[in-house]
Curated annotation (Swiss-Prot):
Organism: Alkaliphilus metalliredigens (strain QYMF)
Record region (G1): 19-26
Taxonomic lineage from the root: Bacteria, Bacillati, Bacillota, Clostridia, Peptostreptococcales
Top EC category: hydrolase
Family: Belongs to the TRAFAC class translation factor GTPase superfamily. Classic translation factor GTPase family. EF-Tu/EF-1A subfamily.
The protein's name: Elongation factor Tu 1
EC id: 3.6.5.3
InterPro entries linked to this entry: EF-Tu_GTP-bd (IPR041709), EF-Tu_GTPase (IPR050055), EFTu-like_2 (IPR004161), EFTU_2 (IPR033720), G_TR_CS (IPR031157), P-loop_NTPase (IPR027417), Small_GTP-bd (IPR005225), T_Tr_GTP-bd_dom (IPR000795)
Length: 397
């Protein structure tokens, strides 16, 4: 039996379920796979306990349990992540282990919004999950129409509070458990309705090749008579020979350079694109003027910064993290892309200290500027070991 060929005829979208513990995220994930399998004959039906026993993965030195399922609608191919525990969600969203183009917020109609409902919406805002669709679950347990409307209003208010368009967000009322029991019935229709909403509300993500060019510099050589070569893996976009690009980071202002060649596996190319490991030949710069930790990028697309707000997860002792809390003014190394930069942290007002296992919003100031933008992931390290993970939430300067 040969491996089934992966058909990439439909647009691909990454989504995930978020929401409070026991509100039905995993049941909904199982119900989606079964309903989609029944209605469209695509993907495999995945049972609840298979999703619940999610395998552990390591991302940036942090162990996270995540379940991955995939399925298709008429219009799209979806890769869907579901996490068993709240801590896994926090870690997953902050490390970007499972990048989401949009999320399904699952909220129990019987309980209404709970603390983790709020926290997952806040995390989505902080880490840059751009779109949320709401599934009000367990509606079979609520007879009172007014109560359903009340819960819907509460969820919409919560979305508005964290700068999501709460008034316009699609809210689907259903029952994951009932859909699981009878995917062909009326509760199964609600799953289809959910995906009609997702197909339209969550836009197709911009492909990596369509984004502005960026390549973190990993190594630098000089080739006699030809100039300086910077090597690395192109993170996004396309770079062409004779194009003007900028060198950003570790100095106050970006420096403009001209690409005189792109090499891959010792062959000369006209261009390099996202995912390629290349050497970029640069005119007008000496080997000692460019170093690991800087990035080559489309001019004007990214700037060097030293100060920003970040959402951070601090590793527990069992995860190889610190055994003790840290305080305001803590000075670790921040590992961005390819290099460590020292910086200091400022805790929010009223927060005395941060314990291992916490997640928190903090202000970070680096001693040298790094090419930074919202959504950029980093690790926090002490003496070469990872003690935390973070994501840039907003730039200060």
């Amino acid at each position: 039996m040969g491996k089934a060929k992966f058909e990439r005829s439909k647009p691909h979208v990454n989504i995930g379920t978020i929401g409070h513990v026991d509100h039905g995220k995993t049941t909904l994930t199982a119900a989606i796979t079964i309903t989609m399998h029944n209605r469209y004959g695509t993907g495999g039906a995945v049972a609840f306990d298979m999703i619940d026993k999610a395998p552990e993965e390591r991302e940036r030195g942090i162990t996270i349990s995540t379940a991955h399922v995939e399925y298709e609608t008429d219009k799209r191919h979806y890769a869907h992540v579901d996490c068993p525990g709240h801590a896994d969600y926090v870690k997953n969203m902050i490390t970007g282990a499972a990048q989401m183009d949009g999320a399904i917020l699952v909220c129990s109609a019987a309980d209404g919004p709970m603390p983790q409902t709020r926290e997952h919406i806040l995390l989505s805002r902080q880490v840059g999950v751009p779109y949320i669709v709401v599934f009000l679950n367990k509606c079979d347990m609520v007879d009172d129409e007014e109560l359903l409307e009340l819960v819907e209003m509460e969820v919409r208010d919560l979305l508005n509070m964290y700068e999501f368009p709460g008034d316009d967000t699609p809210v689907i009322m259903g029952s994951a458990l009932k859909a699981l029991e009878d995917p062909a019935g009326p509760w199964g229709d609600k799953i289809v309705e959910l995906f009609d909403a997702i197909d339209t509300w969550i836009p197709e993500p911009v492909r990596d090749t369509d984004k502005p060019f960026l390549m973190p510099v990993e190594d630098v050589f000089s080739i006699t008579g030809r100039g300086t070569v910077a090597t690395g893996r192109i993170e996004r976009g396309i770079v062409k020979v004779q194009e003007e690009i900028s060198l950003v980071g570790l100095s106050e202002a970006p420096r403009k350079l001209v690409v005189t060649g792109v090499e891959m596996f010792r062959k000369l190319l006209d261009q390099g694109q996202a995912g390629d490991n290349v050497g970029i030949l640069l005119r007008g710069i000496q080997r000692d003027e460019i170093e690991r930790g800087q990035v080559l990028a489309k001019t004007g697309s990214i700037q060097p910064h030293t100060k920003f707000m970040a959402e951070v997860y601090v590793l527990k002792k069992e995860e190889g993290g610190r055994h003790t809390p840290f305080f305001d003014g803590y000075r670790p190394q921040f590992y961005f892309r390819t290099t460590d930069v020292t910086g200091s942290i400022k805790l929010p007002e009223g927060v005395e200290m941060v314990m291992p296992g916490d997640n928190i919003t903090m202000e970070i100031e680096l001693i040298s500027p790094i090419a930074t933008e919202e959504g950029l992931r980093f690790a926090i390290r002490e003496g070469g070991r990872t003690v935390g993970a973070g994501v840039v939430a907003s730039i200060i300067e």
